Amino acid sequence: MTARRIDGKAIAQKIHADISLRSHAFLRQWGRSPGLAVVLVGADPASRIYVQKKRETCASVGIASFSANLPADTNPQQLLAHIGELNVNDAVDGILVQLPLPPHFDPEEIIEAIAVEKDVDGFHPYNIGRLALRAPLLRSCTPAGIMTLLQESGIDIKGKEAVIVGASNIVGRPMALELLLAGATVTVCHRFTRDLAAHVGRAELLVAAAGKPGLISGAWIREGAVVIDVGINRLPDGRVTGDVDFAGAEQRAAWITPVPGGVGPMTVATLLQNTLIAAEHRMGAPHV
């Protein structure tokens, strides 16, 4: 068996086309474009690249982007004050603070300072809580993007054994809530999990989000499983790889996402979707 590759780039382009139509309709109706503010603290090269890509993608779908590049020695009070200004700026519908932040920041404090209706990353405790209560509003971008990948690929997960490797607040935990909402039976594996291989081996749907290159051996994968690899790990030789041994897993799985080109494009597409939803809601549409 050779797995079918799930093309995240192609599915993301389909979403971009829909966003473009809706954002231009928004402009015609309200006289302005939906607006996304991206805040970067420091000069981390990878973060700068991500921010630039987000700006370019915003421009391609008719979303206005506002960038603030703050120096690395910005203190928490200064960043909180800037977020406060964005919270009341009527041109801004969504706010994203690029992570990771420098070590002198408490990320949770910063995330909680963002107005819940502008939390387009979907990280605010209010939005995570709504998802837990089966009434999601603005959803965490990577988990929601994965759900779209599955839906667009015609993969039904209701009743399936789903295993998530990684329990972060950004991916693992909200991913578990998304899968529960969709009717899967969910196991979350973490650093204290015993016999990871056994858990992976029973997964009909595997979501790997540990941030450790090659953590999951292809030999562990259940025959016919769906493998979603969230990991984006840069190796010393410059190559980018996921958390799963792709070559081995591809011979056992039915479906698999490549790295890069699988989950990553969907995360950005969902961010833009959230920005549009937030904009429409702020102008009275019954999305959230």
From Swiss-Prot:
Record-listed NADP(+) binding positions: G166, A167, S168, I232
Name of the protein this chain belongs to: Bifunctional protein FolD
Matching SUPFAM superfamilies: Aminoacid dehydrogenase-like, N-terminal domain, NAD(P)-binding Rossmann-fold domains
Similarity field: Belongs to the tetrahydrofolate dehydrogenase/cyclohydrolase family.
HAMAP family per UniProt: THF_DHG_CYH
Protein's gene: folD
PANTHER family: C-1-TETRAHYDROFOLATE SYNTHASE, CYTOPLASMIC, C-1-TETRAHYDROFOLATE SYNTHASE, CYTOPLASMIC-RELATED
Keywords: Amino-acid biosynthesis, Histidine biosynthesis, Hydrolase, Methionine biosynthesis, Multifunctional enzyme, NADP, One-carbon metabolism, Oxidoreductase, Purine biosynthesis
Quaternary data: Homodimer.
Organism: Acidithiobacillus ferrooxidans (strain ATCC 23270 / DSM 14882 / CIP 104768 / NCIMB 8455)
EC number(s) stated in the UniProt entry for this protein: 1.5.1.5, 3.5.4.9
InterPro entries registered for this protein in UniProt: Aminoacid_DH-like_N_sf, NAD(P)-bd_dom_sf, THF_DH/CycHdrlase, THF_DH/CycHdrlase_cat_dom, THF_DH/CycHdrlase_CS, THF_DH/CycHdrlase_NAD-bd_dom
UniProt entry tagged with the keyword Amino-acid biosynthesis: yes
Keyword NADP attributed: yes
